[in-house]
């Protein structure tokens, strides 16, 4: 089975081709928003045809960040999906409008090839009511579609699936309590019971939660109001600061990556690391409490190679608190990149 994975970003389009599960080509089309999705996809098609990916009609998988409650799982990219995306775009216009544009271009450039959409939020559609609900008026929540989401659902779902499989091989209970830690540009922690998430660190947007590479993470709303008002930044300026100039980069004073902060001996990185690891400890404790204990710990994400740094800081605290089961200290790594996780959705669903 051949699969073409497309991951549109704000400025670039990543692609990867797979034949029988093995990656045959990968690359990035930069400036694709400027040249237009049709031109970028024409370029991708030329590349994948040259390596023989189209010799056997491939499945095309398009990555989406936000799918709302309309997309509880991967969905065929057809007219019905586009109608639903238009509806979802009212909730998250920044995330979805560009996806609609590229989805239409996929239908044109890869006409006749089966295509599907896979969303990061799908895994979190069924978060428990107590977890997804904000303490504001239900009428207002409904009107504005306010609720909590997770934004690394593809990693969390794949990692917890593998952790559950390993757990069952031990002849243990069928629904392990999993602490899933995704180490990415915007790190995220989720508590998963078997295959269902019950808590997650992010919220209505990725701004809530742990500090990221440029994202402040959870912050008192009054701070945002002060930045917009007293500091004179205005709403757009405050948002730009909290989303693009804060987090680990804000603490260090220059643009940094998560792995730099977790491994560097520079004093400014050490300070940022202390803040991040403390927040991760608190979030892990919350997840463990919600689960009633932890049977398995699994790491995933772009920076999974830094898992040991986090594990050595967080897990001893959980163990002393009596939150870890007999095998939870034997943490594991789910090392597949996002491109492979997306390719797997073509066969798993």
Annotate each predicted stretch with a short phrase.
Residues 51-99, 113-116, 121-133:
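Short beta-strand-loop/turn "lid" adjacent to the catalytic site in phosphate-handling enzymes
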Residues 305, 319, 323-349:
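Glycine-rich phosphate-binding/hydrolytic loop that grips phosphoryl groups
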Residues 6-39:
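Short glycine-rich, Thr/Ser-proximal phosphate-binding strand/loop in the N-terminal lobe
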Residues 295-317:
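Glycine-rich phosphate-binding loops at beta-strand->alpha-helix junctions
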Residues 158-162, 166, 271-292:
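Phosphate/ATP-binding catalytic cores across multiple sugar-kinase/actin-like superfamilies
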Residues 230-274:
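A mobile "lid/hinge" subdomain adjacent to the ATP/sugar-phosphate binding pocket shared
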Residues 46-59, 166-171, 284-295:
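Phosphate/pyrophosphate-binding loops at sites that engage ATP/ADP/AMP, CoA/4′-phosphopantetheine
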